[in-house]
Amino acid sequence: SVRVQEGVVKVRARSVLEREELGRAPSQEAAILAMRLLRSNDGFFEHVTNPKFRAGVPLASALVQIMYAKLEDVNAGGFHQCASFVLLRLSASSAFASALNDVMPPSSAAKLGLSTDGGQTHTHADGLIHAVHALLCECDYTRVAPLVDPLLTTLRNAAPRWRGPGDVGSA
């Protein structure tokens, strides 16, 4: 959800994911709102991608986790398109791409099917690579055809800022 507080926009991506898990499914509406704000409001984009706040990483992480959870959902095409365009817009920022080097919380990694056994850690870049690979390779091509260009462009935009992906990201 997005709220304005004392003139500053704060992104609360975690609440989107929590509501998704509760079955209220506002994910598509949240993705549409994020896409519209990121495309039409430069101040919002600057705030979300600001290295001081790093608000884009939780937003992207929540969207990637929901995309991964909806791999088999044939009705999630609209959500996947909105989420992929949000990721594409965020990837235009070098600060956001650099922030993807941060270590992903184990709970987030588990939602993407990434192993955390033995203290193994993954970066947000690893999670993004894993989810994009799963979406583009494990789903029916006719469903994911509109997502190929934005998702591959997202990876291409962000990759130069990554400090070496982990085992999952480099596989």
Segments (PLM) and residue ranges:
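Acidic, Ser/Thr- and Gly/Pro-rich intrinsically disordered linkers and low-complexity segments
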Residues: 1-22, 63-75, 127, 131-139
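Eukaryotic scaffolding regions of large macromolecular assemblies
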Residues: 59-65, 76-171
